[in-house]
UniProtKB/Swiss-Prot annotation:
GO terms for cellular component: cytosol. This is Ribosome-binding factor A. Pfam families: RBFA (PF02033). SUPFAM superfamilies: Ribosome-binding factor A, RbfA (SSF89919). One of its GO terms (biological process) is maturation of SSU-rRNA. Monomer. Binds 30S ribosomal subunits, but not 50S ribosomal subunits or 70S ribosomes. It comes from Afipia carboxidovorans (strain ATCC 49405 / DSM 1227 / KCTC 32145 / OM5). One of its GO terms (molecular function) is ribosomal small subunit binding. Disulfide bonds: none annotated. The keyword Signal does not apply. Keywords: Cytoplasm, Ribosome biogenesis.
Amino acid sequence: MPRHSRGKSSSSASGASQRQLRVGELIRHAMADILAQGGVHDDTLAGHIITVPEVRMSPDLKLATVYVMPLGGHDTEAVLAALAHNKKFLRGEVAHRVNLKFAPELRFRVDERFDEAERIEKLLRTPAVQRDLNSDSDDNA
């Protein structure tokens, strides 16, 4: 009879734990508020509307990877550089807003899911794929 381990949950192998997800969501809300309210005094960040679609936490909650996307997708490199330049300030602001034992180190990445979804949509609209989809529906009828 197999023994069940009580230490780590099996969800850690397949994805983030419930706590990682909860803390990531708290930090995402805090970062979105800070950026929306213009809390960072930086010309590059002030000139862009930045969305924060996701924050992924490390298992020890000491590292937060913040996925960002400037509205319109323009100047992503400049926005990432400005966020990296101001990450100490942002870390302090997050620490004030989210009650954690340690303020996590922030790493910023561009969220490329929107670009990937657009690429797939374009691919699905190509004539060759449309022809295949239509022939499959004709075969099933």
